From Swiss-Prot:
Protein's recorded name: Methyltransferase-like 26 B
Name of encoding gene: mettl26b
SUPFAM superfamilies registered for this protein in UniProt: S-adenosyl-L-methionine-dependent methyltransferases
Source domain of life: Eukaryota
Similarity remark: Belongs to the UPF0585 family.
InterPro entries xrefs: DUF938, SAM-dependent_MTases_sf
Amino acid sequence: MLLSPAAERSQGSLLSVIMEILKDQSHRELFGLELGSGTGQHVVHFAQEMPFVTWLPSDTKEESRNSIRAYIEATKAKTVLEPVHLDASEPWDKWAGLPQNSCDIILAINLLQYTPFSTAEGVFKGSGQILKQNGLLMTYGPYAINGTITPICNEQLDETLRQMNPEWGLPDIDVLRQLAFSNGMRMERMIEMPESNKCLVFRKL
């Protein structure tokens, strides 16, 4: 299985946010989709603390899906489904056969920074179709605000990402807000997180 130190550091604070935004629904059985699950550390950690959510992890890389399977087996996570191949930049009807209005929550953790803008567009278009009414999309990572990136460590990260791939980089929160609006969602909350990251919470109207 793969190990991400960054995922290990962030999983506790992310869990706290997700539990808080879902606390009013913890009496129901919920269905969650994680886009770009990576190693699988996050999803199994969430599953252990939130048994009321059934999670579907996804990733485009076979190596990552194998790692997710290993974490599921190692933790005996009963509410994490077999990981699927899902490219969020594709139209929603290619999202692993998920029907419209089928998800209560969709997570995109450190996905939008490491992918082209077409992926961000796909995430919001797809979420607008796949989420139930009042369902939530939560994105996490460092962002630009009104074209400005702070602090210096995030500026340096943005430069590094663009050197790796000119189409990568820190997305602007105002651009994401507009993408959400164009796809029947609104940005409901911006939560400050450790290490100069933020959680953005969007709700489907």
